[in-house]
A protein has these predicted regions:
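Nucleotide-binding/hydrolysis machinery
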Residues: 2, 6, 12-15, 54-59, ...
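Dynamic helix-loop-helix/coil hinge segments at AAA+ ATPase domain boundaries and subdomain interfaces
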Residues: 2-20, 72, 272-277
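Conserved post-Walker A coupling segment in P-loop NTPases
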Residues: 8, 21-87, 98-114, 142, ...
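Short gly/ser/thr-rich secondary-structure transition/capping motifs
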Residues: 67, 84-91, 127-132, 155, ...
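A short beta-strand-to-loop transition that corresponds to the Sensor-1 phosphate-sensing loop
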Residues: 109, 147-152
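Bacterial C-terminal helix-turn-helix
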Residues: 231, 267-282
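Intrinsically disordered or compositionally simple regulatory linkers and C-terminal tails
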Residues: 259-268
């Protein structure tokens, strides 16, 4: 999937050019990578770019969000389990480490791992082997691990909630992703990219943004980063009836300068109101 490589990272700002160079430099190695950045900056896109630019590109890319599952389920999800190892384990199941064999395992929100799972992950990083839950057979895997977090892990290390040895095992190569407000010159390119994507996905004619609207989008703080920008562009494409999206068409929270101080938590993915959409189209 060449479109998941470096060329799929949109932007020509100095920060993005540096990021792309970093990815090209490390793609050929097997070193563990720690990707850091605020929520919505595109950490999985960067992990995919690393994988699909590497010699492992024809092998699996497997993604796990460490925060999305409770610790008991996550352990079985990562390491797999043997038949009968717990209630409901009616068959042997291979975990994500085995599924990613030969390829890349992406561990998102790695700062959320429990101390017990941190120990198990450390062992895999050191020895490239593990046992399934309820099993005794050692399984060896050849995988590259790319981890990501939107937290600063060092304070967690100092507080004793994140293992120092695991931190250094993960942080062999560190790739920080800049927030959108630090690469504003990329915003017009991203708007065009997301507008084209949303038009194709929704089966509607392409639309453009007026210069005034683009200038306003480029000046906004984007606390939710690229994810928030993509939501706003899609909302405008679906709701605005004309061919050109103007400043007045932008959502109120984007037009309102005070909205720049809203927390990213408040800016949830857009929920389209079908009745409102039809009313505006008519």
């Amino acid at each position: 999937d060449s479109l998941s490589g470096v060329e799929n990272l949109v932007g020509r700002s100095p920060a993005m050019l540096q990021l792309k160079d970093q990815i090209r430099q490390i793609a050929g190695s097997t070193s563990t990578v720690l990707v850091t950045g605020e929520s919505g900056t595109g950490k999985e896109l960067v992990a995919r770019a690393i994988h699909f630019s590497s010699p492992r590109s024809q092998e699996p890319f497997v993604s796990v969000n460490c925060m999305a599952l409770n610790p008991g389920v996550l352990e079985s999800e990562l390491f797999g389990h043997e038949k009968g190892s717990f209630t409901g384990a009616v068959a042997m199941r291979r975990g994500r480490f085995e599924q990613a064999s030969g390829g890349t395992l992406f561990l998102d929100e790695v700062g959320e791992l429990t101390p017990e799972l941190q120990v198990k992950l450390l062992r895999v990083l050191q020895e490239r082997r593990f046992e399934r839950v309820g099993g005794s057979e050692e399984i060896e895997v050849d995988i590259r691990i790319v981890a990501a977090t939107n937290k600063d892990l060092m304070p967690l290390v100092q507080a004793g909630t994140f293992r120092e040895d695991l931190y250094y095992r993960l942080n062999v190569v560190h790739i920080p992703i800049p927030p959108l407000r630090e690469r504003r010159e990329d915003i017009p390119l991203l708007v065009a990219h997301f507008a084209e994507k949303a038009a194709k996905e929704n089966g509607i004619p392409p639309k453009t943004f007026s210069t005034e609207a683009l200038n306003h989008l480029s000046g906004y703080e984007w606390p939710g980063n690229i994810r928030q920008l993509q939501n706003v562009v899609e909302r405008c494409l679906v709701l605005v009836p004309g061919d050109v999206i103007t400043l007045e068409d932008l959502p109120a929270e984007i037009r309102d300068e005070e909205a720049q101080f809203k927390s990213a938590v408040d800016l949830l993915p857009v929920q389209l109101d079908l009745a409102d959409t039809l009313e505006r189209i008519e």
